[in-house]
Design a protein with these regions (language model features):
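Helix-to-loop junction immediately C-terminal to a conserved catalytic motif
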Residues: 48
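Conserved ABC transporter NBD signature motif
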Residues: 56-66, 72-73
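Conserved ABC ATPase "signature" region
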Residues: 97, 101-124
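Conserved catalytic motifs of ABC-family nucleotide-binding domains
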Residues: 149
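Catalytic Walker B motif of ABC-type/P-loop ATPase nucleotide-binding domains
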Residues: 153-156
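ABC transporter nucleotide-binding domain
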Residues: 171-261
Length: 305
């Protein structure tokens, strides 16, 4: 649906984004991860057609987006900026109506009423934006982002600074957008949030360090391993495991870490070898690596390069 091809953006001599290539499909939550200044917001703004790339292209449904047809892209994209950007003196209804008019909606009043009902804002319709809590302001900003029913939704730090309940509501909305077959691009520092809802992850530090599903990134960086806890000293069983076809084994006190092609499939054979050589097994579990482990390894590898 939406793709970036060798996308680059420079501000003077500073490179904000370099040679980023990726595709975003319908029904996908695509998470952009990276430290501050990595180019996440700049990437979102290029995808939204708000700034032009210094090099590379944005494609929408196979067609290149440029100066002549940027409006076509904007009509199909909803962008939530990190700051809600509401007019404090206007009411909730007036804020939404202003954007309905800017988008040229045919029935702006009806669209705004539907949106306020959907987002639970009807009872705050006549409240000035300045009087709203941060969570409510974010809810209004999300309603505004989706007012023109975009296919592609770009969210810049949508849960930043929100209380846990408000953040949960935003996550539920994002998942609902995926179910509705919209393409969602999410920029965030919240790795737990990404772990919960993202279908694919891109780690960005000016350039793309990796793009894949969380599980595929884990497998690529750490492989598949079994963690086996035994009674006594685990190192005594390393020779038997290597002879039995498991050459990559590490022992630490009473714990073995064993590389496998498929942890679940290889578990019976590992257990068989250990039991045959007298091991008293306490537990056998696949090793789990968090998305934080993936992220930190990629950032460290890039820093060493």
């Amino acid at each position: 649906m939406l793709s970036a091809v060798h996308l680059t953006r420079r501000f003077g001599n500073r490179v904000a984004v370099e040679d980023a290539t990726f595709e975003i499909a319908r029904g996908e939550i695509f998470a952009l991860l990276g430290p501050n200044g990595a180019g996440k917001t700049t990437t979102l703004r290029m995808l939204a057609g708000l700034i032009e790339p210094s090099a590379g292209e944005v494609h929408l449904s196979g067609h290149r987006v440029g100066r002549g047809n940027a409006e076509r892209l904007r009509a199909r994209v909803g962008l939530l900026t990190e700051a809600p950007g509401l007019w404090d003196r206007l009411t909730v209804r007036e804020n939404l109506l202003t954007y309905a008019w800017l988008h040229g909606l045919r029935e702006p009043d009806q669209a705004v009423e539907r949106s306020m009902t959907t987002f639970g804002l009807s009872d705050r319709a006549n409240d000035a934006a300045a009087l709203l809590s941060k969570g409510l302001k974010q809810r209004v900003a999300l309603a505004r982002t989706l007012l023109h029913n975009p296919d592609i939704v770009l969210l810049d730090e949508p849960t930043s600074g929100l209380d846990p309940e408000s953040a949960r509501e935003v996550r539920e909305l994002i998942v609902k957008l995926r179910i509705e077959q919209r393409a969602v691009v999410l920029s965030t520092h919240n790795l737990d949030e990404v772990e919960r809802i993202a279908t694919r992850v891109a780690v960005l530090r000016q350039r793309m360090l990796a793009v894949d599903t969380p599980d595929a990134l884990r497998a690529r960086l750490f492989g598949h391993r079994l963690r086996v806890v035994v009674t006594g000293h685990a190192g005594a069983f390393i020779p038997a495991l290597r002879t039995g076809g498991h050459p990559d084994v590490v022992a630490d006190d009473n714990t073995l870490s064993i590389a496998t092609r498929d942890a679940l499939r290889d578990t019976p054979d590992v257990v068989r070898v250990l039991v045959q050589h007298g091991a008293a097994i306490i537990s056998v579990v696949p090793e789990e690596h968090s998305l934080e482990d993936v992220y930190l390894r990629l950032i460290k590898e890039e820093a060493r390069a």
